[in-house]
Structures are given as structure tokens and as C-alpha cells.
Design a protein with these regions (language model features):
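Helix-loop-helix "hairpin" substructures at the membrane interface of multi-pass membrane proteins
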Residues: 166-240
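Residue-level recognition of pore/gate-forming positions within transmembrane alpha-helices
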Residues: 54, 83-84, 111, 135-140, ...
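Alpha-helical transmembrane segments within multi-pass membrane transporters and channels
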Residues: 93-139, 269-271
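Membrane-interfacial amphipathic/re-entrant helices at transmembrane-helix boundaries
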Residues: 1-56, 85, 96-103, 339-340
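Transmembrane alpha-helical segments in multi-pass inner-membrane proteins
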Residues: 76, 215-302
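Cytosolic-side transmembrane-helix boundaries in multi-pass membrane proteins
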Residues: 1-29, 198-200, 205-215, 281-340
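Transmembrane helix-bundle core of multi-pass membrane transporters
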Residues: 132-189, 324-332, 339
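Single transmembrane alpha-helix segments in multi-pass membrane proteins
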Residues: 41-93, 117-130, 200-204, 209-210, ...
Length: 340
């Protein structure tokens, strides 16, 4: 029975990755068919795309907040930088797949550069001081957008942005981004980042370059926020400073805290729920924000560590339980027949 129970674990690693890839591709094809076949209305389609964008924003902030243990409040600033960088590039390029990829990469790289510039001095501080500095950064970016109308369009906004953010573009980007972050956190670099979260002094005493890894985590967080910003630009087709206020950063932080600090799966679930909830409550238009707030308060009272805490699940774990459970049932049944 021991050999049977090992079922899924005996499958080669490359085959596990292949199974996961096939399942994800099937989900992408199914989702794209639902969106493009008219099975959902325009509002529902918009929410589906927003969910993907906010998943990436929540997962990216989780790198700095959940894995590193810091409290940045300027995530909307990195999102804005990436959004405007990609939008300006897309307005000058023809509509091609390479243009989309270049825009996403440019948005991420520009945001990561700002992450390094802000991270080097800011990450010497902790707690409230870091929150204040990053909050100031987000507001500076918003003010610059307003006061550079020749580049950003100013208060009226940057318009006529090509709408590149289709269902497949958004969710392929989200899946690849989550896979890259997951791979990073399973590497020795990820373990160093987690060590800093648990005890920075002990990590430094163990030989971990805390300054380097704090800036690394911060810049990775900023990079994927910039990519999400680029997706947002390609989704809306217009960017205004009001899209990137302090409340945007707070909303993203709420998703991370609600899902569970340090849980990628929690961030994904919370982002999906909080993005879809306003649409689900539209029948209660007068009270939907009150209901939204009450649900958040009740959840945090009864689940203060978030929906999943620090627990993460994966396709591999789910498949392992399903396969092992099925094999165990068959083995037990066969043993019963033999005994009879």
C-alpha cells in the first residue's frame, strides 16, 4: 500500500510540470471561449479582466508585504509608472504581439528601476516610517502625472491607448508572473527573503546580505506592479491621475491582508472576491459599499490571519491528493475482495 500511496509523488518532476501546464492551458482556452462567445455580458467581461489585473497587483505586493515583512503604501505609484510607460510605447507601435510583450516588459522594468531608487534609502527604515515614505512616493508620482501634460496628458488623461489587454493576454501574464514569483520564493534567494521577515538580525548574523535582498524583493514587487499597470492601461484605453490615488494602494493592501500575508493563493482568492463583490452586490446599489465593508470587518474579526493565513496550495498538491485518494480507494477495495 505504501507504493500505491506514493502514486503522484513517483511521477517524474518534468511530467508534473507538463500536467500542470496542460491543465492551465485547458482553463485558459475554456475561459477565453466563455469571454469571447458572448456567454458573459460586457460588465461581467470587464470584471473578469479586472480580476486578473488585481490578482497580479495583490500577488506583487505580497512579495514586499507578506514575504519580506515590510509595509509599503506606494504600490499605486509603481502601477502608474508601468501603466504610462507601456501606454506611451504602445501609442507609437503597430498592434502586434511583440509590441504587447515589449510594453509589458517596459512597464515592469521602469517600475523596477523606481523600486530600486526608492528602495535603497527607504528600506533602511521600518514600519510606519517606511509606510510614510512609500506613501509620499505614490503621491509624488500622481502629482508629476498631473504636472506633465505634454507627456502624460495631465488631469484629463492619456487617451487613445491601444486596448491590448485581452483575456488571454491578461491571464497568460498573470500565470507566468505567479510562476516566476513562486520559483523565486522556492530558491535560496527566496529563503533569504523569508529569513529577513522572520528575524532580520539573525539573518544578517547568518551571512544574509539583508540590504541586497530587501531591495531585490522590493524591486521584484515593483516590477510586477508595473506589469499590472501596463495591463490596466491596455484594458481601459485611457489613464488619468485619479486611477492611481492612495486609495488604490490601500485596496491592494486589503486584498493581501484579507488573503493572508505570505500566501500567494490567499492573495489570488481575495483579489478575485473583492473585485467581483461590487458587481455581485449591484442589486443593493444603495447599500453595497456598506455590505462590502461589513463583510471585510467580519472576515478580519473571525479570520485575523486572513482567509488562508500563510498556507499555499498548488495544482501539484491537489492532484497528489486526488490521485493518491483514488488509488488508495481502489487498493482498499481490492484488498477487501481478496480477503473475502
Amino acid at each position: 500500500m505504501d507504493k500505491t500511496m506514493r502514486g503522484y509523488r513517483q511521477i517524474p518532476v518534468w511530467l508534473k510540470y507538463l500536467i500542470n501546464a496542460v491543465l492551465l492551458c485547458a482553463l485558459l482556452v475554456l475561459g477565453n471561449h466563455i469571454v469571447t462567445s458572448g456567454a458573459v455580458n460586457r460588465a461581467q467581461k470587464a470584471v473578469i479582466l479586472q480580476i486578473g489585473i488585481y490578482i497580479l497587483l495583490a500577488v506583487s505586493l505580497n512579495v514586499a508585504t507578506g514575504y519580506l515583512g515590510q509595509l509599503p503604501l506606494g504600490h499605486a505609484g509603481f502601477m502608474a509608472v508601468g501603466a504610462y510607460a507601456a501606454a506611451l510605447l504602445w501609442k507609437t507601435l503597430p498592434k502586434t504581439t511583440w509590441a504587447v510583450i515589449l510594453g509589458l516588459l517596459l512597464g515592469g522594468l521602469v517600475a523596477a528601476a523606481f523600486g530600486v531608487i526608492i528602495g535603497v534609502p527607504a528600506l533602511r527604515l521600518k514600519g510606519d516610517y517606511l509606510a510614510i515614505i512609500t506613501l509620499g512616493f505614490g503621491e509624488i508620482i500622481r502629482v508629476l502625472i498631473i504636472n506633465l501634460p505634454g507627456i502624460t496628458g495631465g488631469t484629463p488623461g492619456l487617451m487613445s491607448i491601444p486596448k491590448h489587454s485581452t483575456f488571454l493576454t491578461v491571464y497568460i501574464t498573470v500565470i507566468l508572473s505567479c510562476a516566476l514569483i513562486h520559483t523565486l520564493m522556492k530558491s535560496r534567494h527566496g529563503r533569504a527573503i523569508l529569513a529577513i521577515r522572520e528575524n532580520e538580525i539573525a539573518a544578517e548574523a547568518s551571512g544574509v546580505n539583508t540590504t541586497f535582498y530587501k531591495v531585490l524583493a522590493f524591486s521584484v514587487s515593483a516590477f510586477f506592479a508595473g506589469v499590472a499597470g501596463a495591463l490596466y492601461a491596455g484594458y481601459t484605453g485611457i489613464l488619468t491621475p485619479s486611477n492611481f490615488t492612495f486609495m488604490t494602494s490601500i485596496n491592494i493592501l486589503v486584498m493581501v491582508v484579507l488573503g493572508g500575508l505570505g500566501s500567494m493563493a490567499g492573495s489570488i482568492i481575495a483579489a478575485g472576491i473583492l473585485t467581483a463583490l461590487p458587481l455581485m452586490l449591484q442589486s443593493f446599489s444603495k447599500y453595497r459599499m456598506v455590505i462590502y465593508a461589513v463583510l471585510l470587518i467580519v472576515t478580519m474579526i473571525f479570520k485575523p490571519s486572513g482567509l488562508l493565513g500563510r498556507y499555499d496550495f498548488s495544482l501539484s498538491r491537489i492532484l497528489e491528493k486526488l490521485i493518491n485518494g483514488r488509488l488508495f480507494t481502489r487498493k482498499a477495495g481490492k484488498a477487501g475482495e481478496d480477503h473475502a
